[in-house]
Structure formats: structure tokens, C-alpha cells
Amino acid sequence: MESVALHRRGNLAPSASALATESARPLADRLIKSPKPLMKKQAVKRHHHKHNLRHRYEFLETLGKGTYGKVKKARESSGRLVAIKSIRKDKIKDEQDLLHIRREIEIMSSLNHPHIIAIHEVFENSSKIVIVMEYASRGDLYDYISERPRLNERDARHFFRQIVSALHYCHQNGIVHRDLKLENILLDASGNIKIADFGLSNLYHKGKFLQTFCGSPLYASPEIVNGKPYVGPEVDSWSLGVLLYILVHGTMPFDGQDHKTLVKQISSGAYREPCKPSDACGLIRWLLMVNPIRRATLEDVASHWWVNWGYSTRIGEQEALREGGHPSGDSGRASMADWLRRSSRPLLENGAKVCSFFKQHVPGGGSTGPGLERQHSLKKSRKENDMAQTLQNDPAEDTSSRPGKNSLKLPKGILKKKASPSSGEVQEGPQELRPVSNTPGQPVPAIPLLPRKGILKKSRQRESGYYSSPEPSESGELLDAGDVFVSGDPMEQKSPQASGRLHRKGILKLNGKFSRTALEGTAPSTFGSLDQLASPHPTARASRPSGAVSEDSILSSESFDQLDLPERLPETPLRGCVSVDNLRRLEQPPSEGLKRWWQESLGDSCFSLTDCQEVTAAYRQALGICSKLS
């Protein structure tokens, strides 16, 4: 079988910003409340003293360049290596990019997880924002996989488990990443996963829908490619399924050569079936369900048997064990049964033997309820811009007093809560919610249609994971639905207020190189520091071309204000010890060594979900081992 190379694709350009209401509130007010908060919910503060960063860091090579600046490797006086991202404020051209940058800094500075890139410090002056981040020395996961014909299952599980742990932590705190891909997953010096690039991340709420069509084409979910609203976590689950397929099989699940074929395959869930099935096939099938309601959640993945095979605890139980809890033998057997019941969910559609087995051996396996239907493609419904949309009213800000988008004034300090708009036409009174009928006799409001082509069309060069993701796109100006929280049924929405079209621009990258064409012939606006809320926007200095950045301009000899980041909780250690997998290997003959994946036969799989008898045998063997351990 000819191996299909991994394709590098750029990101879908996010749609026009309708997020001014939702994103203007501090991150602390919008985080999901929990009895044991995993993050400190504090605002970003300012130090009232200046810093000359050239005296604090020794700058080494440049890691990458982007639309807004560059990322450099640097060494502190203590010897610690860091990655420093510089953002030039005169490159920020619209409200949408402003919200992405501000949200990325707020979210990443609040997250504290061993597998997420940490922000150490943030500095700002009148012309630049400088972000000091954790440095991942071994590059990204794309290069790591490309250098190897195929990862063995143990290594694939090791990487995937760390990705799931970080993403599960984000979802527990109400954060959706929305741009998971190999290029945004870095490796540190110890070979551990570090997820980067939260430029497209956002907060999500149950019962409300997001509508930004963003992400990378080969990792985009059916909701994204078809322009349907989504809650958020289901988009990450789909991308996680694509990542698992790549880790296990070494190829992309969908054909990225042709746009029409790619959209059709994603919409129907018709991924390429490997010639050599893996034990993870059931989990891949569950994650790549077209119906988002039936798609595996991060809770399902964290408790799946394949993810936890060879580990003493499930991902969701690590925090409890760290605090002193100890699972009993009965709970271990129940966990094993739960893993198999969850992992076999997609298999129950066609496996009568498995259904009968669970009815006999697993309590509740034959519970009543709606039967599992055969997976099918979602019909191509009316595009989201054919529907009438509504903005969710924010109690902290009245949408009836929101001016038009073109009249918004950009704030001087982009990390500070924005002041209310001071000018623009105001639409008097909220519009009444009106359901939209899909009957042929009733006309649908005339709203610009989503393009039939172009969403996933053009390929982009690959980017560094330190960069934020959205890029310009030929079809970007046609994607008008921004990140809007829509409550209730997405079919019952009202039309948003018509506004001028914003330019779609990347956050820190355009084809991996610094762009000069976007600002030619224009006078870019600049932004002041955080202590200035409103003042006339000065024009850029005429002595420096708008598209040029000198080698020393990242810090030069300027003074910066340091921003006080939220305090972080101690990191949660990941545990590992002798497990069921280790005990099983004691009874097996020594392995003859790893073979090429195309040389292995189907019978080499020790626990394939395609064989019901193997499932039964492995389950009984695992129960026997658990009873001996208890």
C-alpha cells in the first residue's frame, strides 16, 4: 500500500467578528464555575515600572515570522531558554484580530497544565506587545511523525494520552481550542506534548452555539465545512479523531488533494480505511462520527480503555489519586467493563454477538432506551447564513445600544477591558425573535450565502506552533457569521444588524513569512498602552516602512511595562506504575521486534475490535487479572 504523505494546510479564515459583546467581558466573568477551580480567575494587571528587555534576555535565532512580528529564541540570565513573541500594534488592522490576540493572552495566561505551553511574562509599550513563553526544543509533532514510517502503538498512546489530558483540562474550564493539528502540538526536551496556539480558542457555554468557521481544512469537522453552528467541544473531538488516526496509521484520514472530495468525505465521515486495523479503530470511529450528538466527548475519550491501557488510572481520576484516593478492586473491574462498553458503542450497530455478550455479562448493557442507529451522513442542510441569526443579549452590555461595526473605535490598550463605543448608528429596540420556516411557500430573508467553494480550497505553507492561526483566505470575505452565542434551537434565530465588511487577516502568520502587501498604500493605526483608554490614533512612523521589521526591532532599546499574569496552581503530576498491561506481557513470549506496518498481518493484533471473540477473551482475561490484584 502506498503511504499517503501528510499534507500541510493553512487555516480557514475566521468570519467577521460579532464577538464584541461576548469578548469584552473579562475572562474571569465567563469561566465555568466549579467547586474546585483549576484556574485562577484574575485580571491581567500592570507593573508600574519599566523594563529594558535587551538587558534581561540574550536573543538567539529567529523561530519564525508572521504578519504581526516575529518569534525569537532567547536565554534568560538564569540560563532558561524561552520563546519571545513580539506583536507590533501598528499591524493590527481590525477589531477581530484585536479580540483574538487579547483572548489568546488571557486564556493562555490562565491555563496551567504540564502539556500546554505556558506564558511566563507579558510586556507592553506604546508600539509593541511582547509575550515570553515556554520554549519547546524538539519542534512539532508533524516533523516527529514525518521522520518515522509509523509510531508503535505504545508511543501513539503516550502522545495521544497527553493531548487528551490537556484538552480535557481545557474543556473542564469551558475553553475550546478549535485549531488542533500536528503543527500546533510541540515537543519539549523530554519528548512530552506541549499544545500551543490558542489564537482561535474561545469560551463555550452549553445551550449556546458558536458560528466561527475556523480551523485547518484537514482537521475541520462536518459542522465547520457545512457552515452549521456548534457548541464547541464536538469540534475538538473531531480534530482529536484525526490526530489519533495519524498517530496510529501514519497517514491522513481524508484526501486533501481535491476540495470537493475533501468536503464530501468529511461530510459523510468516509475516511480511508487502513489495510491493517488497529486496536484504536473503535475509538477513531467514535471520534469521527458525523452526528455531533453521537460523537465521543472528552469525558468518553478520557475513560476509554485504549487510552488507559497500560496505565494504573484513567485520565479523569488522576486528580483524585493525587489528593489521596485509592480505587478498590471492584471499581477496577467496573472501570474495565465501562471501558469496553464505551469503546464498543459504535460496534454495536452491526455486532449482534457483542450486544448479546454485554447483555449477559455487563449490568445495564441491555438497558432500555433509544436504539443505536446506523451512522449516516447528515443531509446538506441550508447554510447557516440562509437562516435568520440572533445575538445573545449580554446582561453586562445592552445589544440595543451597540453601534455598527464600522464605527467602533479600537481601544488603546488591547489587554484592558474595552470602553463602550462612542459613536455610530444605534438600532432602536431589540428585534423580536422570529422562527424561520423552511417551507417552500415562505420566503427566507435575503442574507449573503456561504460560498460553495473556497472554504477549504487553497493550501498554505506550514506554520510554527508559537504563532496564532487565522490567515487571510480568498473566501474569507464571504464568511460573515462571527463567533456568536446563539441560544436554543439554531433554526430559530434572527438576522444580525447589517454592518460593513472587515478585512480578514492572520494573527501572526501569512504563508509563514512576513507580509508586506496587506498594508501597502494605507496608513496603519497604532494602539497605546494599557493606561490609555481613549485618544486619537496616531499614524505610524514614516521613518519605517509598514512592512519592514529590522532584526533588533523586536525589543531594541525601548522600555516596556510588565503585565502581572494570573497566579497558577501547582501542576498536576502524571502517574505511572505497573499495570494490567505489564502483567499480561509476563505471560506472553518475547516479541520478535517491531515490523513495518505494511508487513504486519491482521492476526498480529492482540486485541482487535473487529473480532468479537477476541473482545470476549481479552475481557475475561482482564477480569481475572483484576480479581487477582484485588
From Swiss-Prot:
Gene3D superfamilies (UniProt xref): Transferase(Phosphotransferase) domain 1
Residue intervals of the Protein kinase domain: 57-307
GO molecular function: ATP binding; magnesium ion binding; protein serine kinase activity; protein serine/threonine kinase activity
Cofactor dependence: Mg(2+)
Residue ranges, compositional bias (Low complexity): 464-476
Activity regulation information from UniProt: Activated by phosphorylation on Thr-212 by STK11 in complex with STE20-related adapter-alpha (STRAD alpha) pseudo kinase and CAB39.
UniProt tissue specificity: Expressed in liver, skin, testis, uterus, ovary, adrenal gland and brain (at protein level). Expressed in kidney, heart, skin, spleen, lung, uterus, liver and the exocrine and endocrine compartments of the human pancreas. A kinase-inactive isoform also appears to be expressed in the skin, spleen, lung, uterus, liver and testis.
Region (Disordered): 361-504, 521-566
Residues annotated with N-acetylmethionine modification: 1
This protein's record includes keyword Transport: no
Binding site for ATP: 63-71, 85
Catalysed reactions listed for this entry: L-seryl-[protein] + ATP = O-phospho-L-seryl-[protein] + ADP + H(+); L-threonyl-[protein] + ATP = O-phospho-L-threonyl-[protein] + ADP + H(+)
Function in brief: Stress-activated kinase involved in tolerance to glucose starvation. Induces cell-cell detachment by increasing F-actin conversion to G-actin. Expression is induced by CD95 or TNF-alpha, via NF-kappa-B. Protects cells from CD95-mediated apoptosis and is required for the increased motility and invasiveness of CD95-activated tumor cells. Phosphorylates LATS1 and LATS2. Plays a key role in neural tube closure during embryonic development through LATS2 phosphorylation and regulation of the nuclear localization of YAP1 a critical downstream regulatory target in the Hippo signaling pathway.
UniProt-recorded name of the protein: NUAK family SNF1-like kinase 2
Species per Swiss-Prot/TrEMBL record: Rattus norvegicus (Rat)
The encoding gene: Nuak2
